């Protein structure tokens, strides 16, 4: 079983517009609202892929109830209730672009943070892999993911971390290391304090930096150019085909779902990387965030090339 953790979930609202006009009224006909937050995208894709998945995080208010009520029944909902209200995040799709408006989310008390920590420990009993995704809610210290990873490690669970900024830096500088991290080039540049490009030689060098010591997998997203990955002492480039992108929202989360599934099923490197990229691409072909059309899975799987470099 896979446990997905979304500490700062949201209701994701999508507004498609032919044109975004500033300083005037924009009327939207086709509005989509879904339970959101990176970890919830992960759990929906895992569910559609056929994995047994349990979802947790901190939710509150009517917006929190919306999330529970709109997740598929086959996902085991194990959320922790807080006093604040779950946030709303808006994506405006216009002229081939995407503009996002993201609420910060609720402030958690010390008691609520401690309560979730105990809740998390309890949920680990029957899981193999834990995914930790997205931003931390207000009130949580930057090293909170580090704390959860330490607990998971003590219980023999594999962990996939997908976050950025101070939370990611705290984990990299801490003692407890996740099994996998999945930065993109922008996040990698921020971590290292220098601009990174898609140059394989440069990527190979920086992924051997002591900052990443102790992390088994580092999977760097290159967007439409695929992935550059390091597993222990082996490096891979993943070439992906060109596809028509409907919406890239949630594609990185779908990739995390593939990584978690690969770990849970003890797949070899090539199978894990291929599955992860296929699920990310399938999500990009859909309007709905965190959704994949499995009818297209096999065709895309055959088109992906994983090369050791």
Swiss-Prot record:
Catalytic reaction equation(s): D-tagatofuranose 6-phosphate + ATP = D-tagatofuranose 1,6-bisphosphate + ADP + H(+)
Keyword Kinase (UniProt): yes
GO CC entries: cytosol
InterPro entries in UniProt: LacC (IPR005926), PfkB_dom (IPR011611), Ribokinase-like (IPR029056), Tagatose/fructose_Pkinase (IPR017583)
Protein's pathway: Carbohydrate metabolism; D-tagatose 6-phosphate degradation; D-glyceraldehyde 3-phosphate and glycerone phosphate from D-tagatose 6-phosphate: step 1/2
Keyword annotations from UniProtKB, A to Z: ATP-binding, Kinase, Lactose metabolism, Nucleotide-binding, Transferase
The protein's Enzyme Commission number: 2.7.1.144
Class in the EC hierarchy, top level: transferase
Domain of life: Bacteria
Pfam families assigned to the protein according to its UniProt record, in alphabetical order: PfkB
One Gene Ontology molecular-function label: tagatose-6-phosphate kinase activity
Keyword Methyltransferase tagged: no
GO process terms (BP): D-tagatose 6-phosphate catabolic process; lactose catabolic process via tagatose-6-phosphate
UniProt cross-references to HAMAP family, sorted A to Z: LacC (MF_01557)
Family: Belongs to the carbohydrate kinase PfkB family. LacC subfamily.
Name of the protein described by the UniProt record: Tagatose-6-phosphate kinase
Record organism: Streptococcus pyogenes serotype M3 (strain ATCC BAA-595 / MGAS315)
Gene symbol of the encoding locus: lacC
